[in-house]
Amino acid sequence: MVVDCHIHMALDGGYWKDALARHKEAPDEQFIRKTLETYKSLGFTYLRDGGDRWDAGKRASELAPEYGLCYRTPLFPIYRKGHYGSFIGRGFETLNDFRALVSEVKARGGHFIKIMISGLMDFNRYGVLTDEPMPGALIRELTNIAHGEGFSIMAHANGDAAVRGAILAGIDSVEHGAYLTDETLQMLAESKTVWVPTLVTIGNLIGDARFPEEATRPLLAYQMAAVRKAADFGALIAPGSDAGAYRVFHGQGGLDELALLRRALGDAADEILARGTAEIEARF
């Protein structure tokens, strides 16, 4: 039994614009079925999608029982207009806008809420993020709205400020979590927030000429050390690959992520990851 707590059915591990184009008229059911069959053949039992605004993840969730898979989706990620997330999500400007999107997720059968509260890791420049973090007060407002509607929350979050904001707001899981300090890792361990580090999004870039290894190698080393520290502190950690991201292929990406987490966590890896996975499955 294998799980992947962060995938994107709308993407395919190649160029994102080409991948999304196949779903823009309607979700590409042939692609979705082939991908679900891949997961089934590799022994996966649980998948959690990060969402897309073309309903590829939604269609996958409808088809997944045919393949013996539990598949959870937020329908689409929600981002603050003017900040990261426009390529795949739905945007809001006001809290009323956000409430309306949450209501839409509920009405259309989404399983949880996904929000974007930071930028990306800059894979060309070590130590750099591509956008400012969402203010902590706004993160709390969004969390209260979503929790008030009975939803758990998955948050794309990089950097200390965004992840601390997520922890303090009571967000259920944080994805990626680049460049966290020991203090933030300790906060994570003292909270109920689950960290899904998506190490393979970095690891699978090493050896690719697109990004300089003087950026990707130290970034992977930093993240693997942070995962080890977080586990030592007692944090909840779960495996998620961000499958569909560049060079993270469906199915194999989840196995690659598990291999990196086992390298980082050592002999206790499976026990540590089982704790985090149980929390994800229970809440999402």
What do the predicted segments below correspond to?
Residues 13-18, 163-169, 201-213, 223, ...:
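Histidine/acidic-residue-rich catalytic or RNA/ligand-binding cores of hydrolases
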Residues 29-58, 68-78, 110-124, 152, ...:
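Divalent metal-dependent hydrolysis catalytic cores, especially in the metallo-beta-lactamase
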Residues 10-27, 81-92, 124-132, 206-215:
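Acidic/histidine-rich helix-loop elements
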Residues 2-63, 82-85:
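Metal-associated gating/positioning segment near the N- to mid-region
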Residues 148, 221-284:
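His/Asp/Glu-enriched, well-ordered alpha-helical/loop segment
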Residues 8-12, 49, 53-57, 79-80, ...:
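Active-site environment of divalent metal-dependent phosphoester hydrolases
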Residues 96-116, 121-195, 217-237, 271:
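Histidine/acidic residue-rich metal-binding segments in metalloenzymes
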Residues 30, 52, 90-100:
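Glycine-rich anion/phosphate-binding loops
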